[in-house]
Amino acid sequence: LKAKIYSSFVYPVSLSDAKLLEDVIIAGFPLGKEVSAAIKISKGSVSSLAGYGDNYSNFQTDAALNQGNSGGPIINKKGNVIGVAVANYGKKEGIESFNFGVKSSTLRAFANSNGIDFEYPNTRELTNSKLGELITEGTVFIECHMTLSKIKKVVNELEKNKKAVYEQFIK
């Protein structure tokens, strides 16, 4: 993995999970640098409080989530992380807006169990220009320099150990 990080900014993480119909912004680099090296955002709302297969550590959003958004922040109008972009299932089946994020409570639990601290969340909504500044400063492009065959090997290994990996992440 390779990243150029020029800022010490850390997103604050929300103390509460996303709310149904809450406005969200997904920040990331869909298609990597193929389109451009500039950050891209999509806006939408929380459309379900459960993820695929009734996974309650995730939520669903109608904000566009594409390859290259995974691992990126899903933030609210206060600039707080309310989730992390993880999956888009709709394109395979021709369904739109079937996008998922890991809830902030799951993120906090994982971080707390690994001794990672967070910034205290913002309490007021931010202007669009301020949100844009925070997103630009707080979201970085991370390149993966693995070959496709190595990635497939890692994915196959994860699939074999999915339950153990999942249980370790959820603790």
Task: Kindly give the residue locations of the regions a language model identified.
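Conserved active-site neighborhood of the chymotrypsin/trypsin-like protease fold
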Residues: 1-36, 54-58, 115-125, 148-150
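Pocket-edge structural micro-motifs
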Residues: 28, 63, 144
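C-terminal subregion of chymotrypsin/trypsin-like serine protease catalytic domains
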Residues: 80-171
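A generic local secondary-structure boundary/capping motif
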Residues: 13-15, 71, 130
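Active-site region of chymotrypsin-like
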Residues: 1-10, 37-116
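A broad, low-specificity signal marking well-ordered, structured residues that form hydrophobic/aromatic
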Residues: 24, 44, 59, 139-140
